[in-house]
UniProtKB/Swiss-Prot annotation:
A single GO cellular-component term on record: cytosol
Catalytic activity reported: N(6)-[(R)-dihydrolipoyl]-L-lysyl-[lipoyl-carrier protein] + a hydroperoxide = N(6)-[(R)-lipoyl]-L-lysyl-[lipoyl-carrier protein] + an alcohol + H2O
Main location: cytoplasm
GO MF annotations in UniProt: thioredoxin peroxidase activity
Record-linked Pfam families: AhpC-TSA
EC numbers: 1.11.1.28
Descriptive protein name: Alkyl hydroperoxide reductase C
Species: Mycolicibacterium smegmatis (strain ATCC 700084 / mc(2)155) (Mycobacterium smegmatis)
Amino acid sequence: MALLTIGDQFPEYDLTAVVGGDLSKVDAKQPDDYFTRVTSKDYEGKWRIIFFWPKDFTFVCPTEIAAFGKLNEDFEDRDAKVLGVSVDNEFVHFQWRAQHEDLKTLPFPMVSDLKRELTAACGVLNADGVADRATFIVDPNNEVQFVSVTAGSVGRNVDEVLRVLDALQSDELCACNWKKGDPTINAGELLAGAV
């Protein structure tokens, strides 16, 4: 399937995830208490940051996942929900979170796309059968507004994802390297001044 692009509707999903938050504070009576269902309906009407990584227990991936975790409150302040997805199962996600110091208190769900249906529908399932390192910003109307895919060896810039979200939410024309609080471009003034 082709890579989703700007204006496409983000696919529906109903997947299992490791709950967000400090795993040591989960009131777990049984192993299943660490897991939850995550569906596309859960965040209807909200901005979503949905990012994919290739594999758990690797080297670049935890740096990115932890970076999204550190900025989660900033995304929440912008009424945006973060979801991280890979094709690993929920038990692998759980073990990785439990063992990796930077992931133990991850505030958002780690989603398992074991059947690879969402990964394929987004167009980021690669020839190795795992997800490409991809990021989607999806608006409250479920429309893709930003797509980024990097090589497996190159981690993404989470600050840039936040910057782009700010620009998209400004609903204005934003120049190169624009940051929240910077002036936006007034095309009307520019056109009037050119005549």
